[in-house]
Amino acid sequence: MSNNEFHQRRLSATPRGVGVMCNFFAQSAENATLKDVEGNEYIDFAAGIAVLNTGHRHPDLVAAVEQQLQQFTHTAYQIVPYESYVTLAEKINALAPVSGQAKTAFFTTGAEAVENAVKIARAHTGRPGVIAFSGGFHGRTYMTMALTGKVAPYKIGFGPFPGSVYHVPYPSDLHGISTQDSLDAIERLFKSDIEAKQVAAIIFEPVQGEGGFNVAPKELVAAIRRLCDEHGIVMIADEVQSGFARTGKLFAMDHYADKPDLMTMAKSLAGGMPLSGVVGNANIMDAPAPGGLGGTYAGNPLAVAAAHVVLNIIDKESLCERANQLGQRLKNTLIDAKESVPAIAAVRGLGSMIAAEFNDPQTGKPSAAIAQKIQQRALAQGLLLLTCGAYGNVIRFLYPLTIPDAQFDAAMKILQDELSD
């Protein structure tokens, strides 16, 4: 059956709200290569939206999941617990850069992790308010939609949203927003909208994902830490997209001296299996009463088995170092192109969490059309890219960190050709 035939079936069988970017259907995948039902091959620089830092079907991961399949697939951890969940929590506790002794709880999706981080913060503080940042993305459930700082397409027609959620600008040199602007906005909130002692949490992405890979300045993170300490507010770092070697360190927060109280994680945690988590200060994590946290599939044993292997792969294959090496090569390609491509307004990121932002050279305004044109032309040449950003004018690069050098070089050649065309 052809891609077009599957496409027609999709239109009839699934709602339009489940938007689909590609007009082809996956048949198989291995490492950084994706093959469709017609045999066409693509270099995958989307990786299921940052889920596959260890590549499609890493042999070690496949073996671990197969082994777990032979034992048991589900008990519901809250009913019958299992050792692998506890051991994974111990590993994350030892690795995560959070304040004090750590504890970890596992869930299923990134949105679920963020929801539970907010629950934990509210339980700990007894306060309702949450401050988030414009351009941030935290999920598609009602609380996480409220936290998300982008309207289209995530919020259209779905309101009203939960209350006691407030937004402040995220720093951006390109768009003229300084760290001081962000901090002044928080202080204005305290004066005009919600008193500081009613704020449970401040949540931020150290590198914004959907927002366009804007990197939080160290001064901002330090100031958030000071504000949280001063007012008894829980500091939450959302590492759903930035975690597990993507930024050249295991977590993006490893780039900063200041530690959050809670961190959320998901996506590449289990290499394609659905698993998320919240790790944080043990005193804060223990605030909810027994039974207050959990979920039927939370910490599923198949996904937990995969996560154990992901941590091993990152260490064994030096993927943090690999992320820095590949990211520098990508940055060099983009910076070189910027000299002759005036539409490239900025190149930014950490490690292999790199993005390029595009403006109309004539007006200087954000141009989603230019980003989409490059994306579509690259796809026609077999390179799968994603766009993002508040204006849809950013191309983000999320290749598996296990991609072979020759394949990465081939992708760079396609990118160079399409940027200069």
Give, region by region, the residue ranges found by the protein language model:
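Conserved N-terminal phosphate-binding loop of PLP-dependent enzymes in the Aspartate aminotransferase
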Residues: 1-421
